[in-house]
From Swiss-Prot:
One of its GO terms (biological process) is sporulation resulting in formation of a cellular spore. To B.subtilis CotZ. Keywords: Disulfide bond, Sporulation. The keyword Disulfide bond applies. This is Spore coat protein Y. Disulfide cross-linked either to itself or to CotZ. Signal peptide: none annotated. It comes from Bacillus subtilis (strain 168).
Length: 162
């Protein structure tokens, strides 16, 4: 398969990967002890129900979007993120929640590169985007340990939004 060519739904590697991620997340949420991908998510560890990932466009660029536009929720800060969690999948269209990047203090960041030196972890949000997975050529799964990563600092400026 190559980028930009029209293929059937089952020939899109990004769509297939997101479908597998969703199945694994749902298995953990349902406390399914026999998930096929338990090496990524362990159903016995409470709170680890997210496989964060990055998606790349057909030119190799990272896809990014914005959360909390207008600053109406939590710390009132709009942010840019390249990190996502799959929520729903229908054919090759997906609802992705935008994961909020945070620094070691738990403050919201705008992150356009995964190696940003201030980036420490991710928090789940209720901000979502609808995407056509056929528009992407690559996906990179990240460690579930990035989500709700424990920080040595306690004074956070916003509340967790799950």
């Amino acid at each position: 398969m190559s980028c930009g060519k029209t293929h059937g739904r089952h020939e899109n590697c990004v769509c297939d990967a997101v479908e597998k991620i969703l199945a694994e997340q749902e298995a953990v949420e349902e406390q399914c002890p026999t998930g096929c991908y338990t090496n990524l998510l362990n159903p016995t560890i409470a709170g680890k129900d997210t496989i964060p990932f990055l998606v790349f466009d057909k030119k190799g660029g990272l896809f990014s979007t914005f959360g909390n536009v207008g600053g109406f929720v939590d710390d009132m800060q709009c942010f840019e993120s390249i990190f996502f969690r799959v929520e729903k999948l229908c054919d090759c269209c997906a609802t992705l929640s935008i994961l909020r990047p945070v620094d070691v203090k738990g403050d919201t960041l705008s992150v356009c590169h995964p190696c940003d030196p201030d980036f420490f972890g991710l928090e789940k949000t209720d901000f979502c985007i609808e995407v056509d997975l056929g528009c992407f050529c690559a996906i990179q799964c990240l460690s579930p340990e990035l989500v709700d990563r424990t920080s040595p600092h306690k004074d956070k400026k916003h509340h967790h939004n799950g």
